[in-house]
């Protein structure tokens, strides 16, 4: 029947995803490192709670509507994709018929790029705040206002910051302690630069963690707003060492890129760490839909 076909269309996207158990060898971790990883896993879950609201306006209301349908497969798909749109099918809605707003949950659903451009032109003093990678744009009457992430998502960021501080208090690795301490501060202040530098300096620890607002792909309105995510990984020293041969040729690779000379950047740092790692836990932007197998962070912003 037509109803049966419609129901099947709502859930068949799950068939394209294979559920695979990823087994990571954690036997070599010390008791201290194990404690730190467990705390980071908890913080990663909070990044997911934030990203659900960034990806889907009215996330909680829509999920309640899906749950009321008493269709386990439909609810499973909603939870798998953090909303009613299928990213594998170019964000085609599988619940309801509303297209995904270009600005996702970063802007009012009815806000257009043209309206935002005109508003910024009329209020140039607000441009920095409205286009910041770390603010949510909301309507207040006829005005557009920028709400810092640290305020908009405080109910998740504050406990996440406390978890990072707790982990920092446990680890005896100086570089990891510094990064986690600074990252906790950044979650409360929206100033991530110092903690990004500390992240680049992580050393002498198997724990590689990236946590915070990074990529802007979810913002299809302005391409500015960063999405929260987390990668809790354990470095594979043997496979990472195998990449050292490529690190020694980074300058040559830059010189041989098939682009005009003006696009080649020889002022960049060529000592950037490159690692192979096993992911223990993901959070936020890297969880729904197709999984990330590599990342290049931090971004210049």
Task: Outline where the language-model segments fall.
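Accessible peptide chain termini
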Residues: 1-2, 301
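Fold-level signature of zinc-dependent metallopeptidase catalytic domains
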Residues: 10-39, 46, 127-301
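N-terminal intrinsically disordered, low-complexity regulatory regions
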Residues: 54, 60-63, 68-169, 177, ...
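N-terminal mature-domain "stem" immediately C-terminal to a signal peptide or N-terminal signal-anchor/transmembrane
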Residues: 3-93
């Amino acid at each position: 029947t037509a109803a049966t076909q419609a129901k099947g269309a709502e859930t068949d996207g799950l068939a394209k995803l294979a559920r695979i158990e990823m087994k990571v060898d954690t036997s070599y971790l010390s008791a201290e490192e194990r404690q730190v990883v467990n705390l980071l896993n908890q913080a990663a879950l909070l990044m997911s709670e934030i990203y659900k609201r960034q990806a889907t306006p009215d996330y909680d209301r829509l999920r309640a509507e899906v749950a009321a349908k008493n269709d386990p497969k439909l609810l499973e798909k909603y939870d798998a994709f953090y909303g009613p749109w299928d990213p594998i099918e170019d964000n085609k809605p599988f619940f309801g018929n509303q297209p995904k707003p270009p600005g996702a949950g970063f802007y009012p659903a009815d806000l257009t790029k043209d309206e935002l451009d005109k508003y910024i032109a009329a209020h140039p003093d607000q441009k920095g705040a409205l286009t910041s990678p770390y603010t949510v744009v909301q309507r207040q009457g006829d005005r557009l206002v920028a709400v810092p992430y640290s305020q908009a998502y405080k109910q998740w960021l504050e406990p996440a910051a406390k978890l990072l501080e707790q982990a920092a208090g446990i680890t005896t690795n100086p570089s990891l302690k510094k990064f986690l301490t600074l990252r906790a501060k950044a979650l409360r202040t929206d100033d991530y630069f110092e903690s990004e530098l500390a992240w680049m300096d992580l050393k002498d620890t198997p724990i590689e963690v990236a946590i915070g607002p990074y990529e802007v792909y979810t913002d299809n309105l302005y391409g500015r707003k960063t999405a929260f995510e987390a990668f809790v990984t354990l470095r594979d020293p043997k496979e990472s060492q195998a990449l050292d041969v490529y690190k020694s040729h980074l300058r040559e690779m830059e010189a041989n890129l098939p682009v005009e000379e003006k696009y080649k950047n020889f002022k960049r740092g060529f000592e950037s760490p490159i690692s192979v790692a096993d992911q223990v836990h993901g959070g936020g932007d890297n969880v729904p839909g197709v999984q990330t197998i590599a990342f290049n962070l931090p971004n210049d912003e």
